[in-house]
Amino acid sequence: PGVSASYLEDKSIQRVHKALGIINVPPLKREDGTYWTKARVIQEFGFPVISKEIAGKVELLQNPSEKNKTVRHAIITGETGEYGGWQKNSKMQLNQRWLQLFGGYENENEGCDFQKPDFLVSAKCCYYLKEKNCDDWGKELNSVPYLGLMASEGGRRAKSLRMNGCNYFGASTIRSAPFAIFHRQDILKLALEMDELWKAGLKEKYHEKLLKEGRLSQSFEMPDSIIPEIYGTIEKKPDGTLYTTKAQRTGCSMCGFGIHMEKRPHRFDLLYESNPKEWDYLMFHMCKDANGNDYGWAKVLDYIGVGWDPSTIGGNCKGQMSLKDFIR
């Protein structure tokens, strides 16, 4: 069956998933028996910002221990110990932009003068909200996943596919990534072909099947297209290149990984248009500081220099990337 942590996605994606009968796997449960939520994970562990790799490094800086002392030194200086081969200028070091904003936790130890924010940073949200719960679901039902990863996406996903291939058989993990060899253009073409089938009668067949299985209510309105509204429509440029008129990529609505590289209107700007109530909550109310005051993504985006005010769309000078931001 199709399985997804759909509750993390945009509502238009959730609607399409429901129309296709995709199983929504809930998040992990906390020790008190309640489920982890976006707000609870962010409040306890920190904001997912910049990238998973960098967020993980900042989280180490924010949680110093004797055990991670050598790693923290490498994050600030690039110098590794014996385990890292005594390297200088290693890739462990944060680039200058992020060192300046997040390296202040080690000022006393390293004799530096960097800043530090008054909010937490972490990459743990993925684990608590989608990774571990989907893994547990697979083990419980003796199933292994087909993942929609593509090497063309780059980053950690491409690295994982290069290391492990399309089909991975490990000691405790088995998974297949059949889309690995395809590119974005292939997926957009497939989406158009599937949408034609949907409009040519597949929608009615799914509706009838899911009603019979008791997985849909009589009042549920099937979407006219299986291309979620958040993407807009799929159009073709003069050179034949396919593109989506709205969002280019989506994921968890509160994720900030890569936000500093997006031109405006970015993902939070689009959320403001589609769901202003959720946008307001994420921007200003999802966390509380030590004094009990609400805050959210607006504070984080201000700190890293990314615009978020809807009235300023059309320019985002503070958040523009420069060549040095890609070094290391």
Place the predicted regions along the sequence by residue.
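ATP-dependent adenylation/nucleotidyltransferase module used to activate substrates
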Residues: 1-186, 193
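ATP/NTP-dependent adenylation/nucleotidyl-transfer catalytic domains that generate, transfer
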Residues: 184-199, 203-328
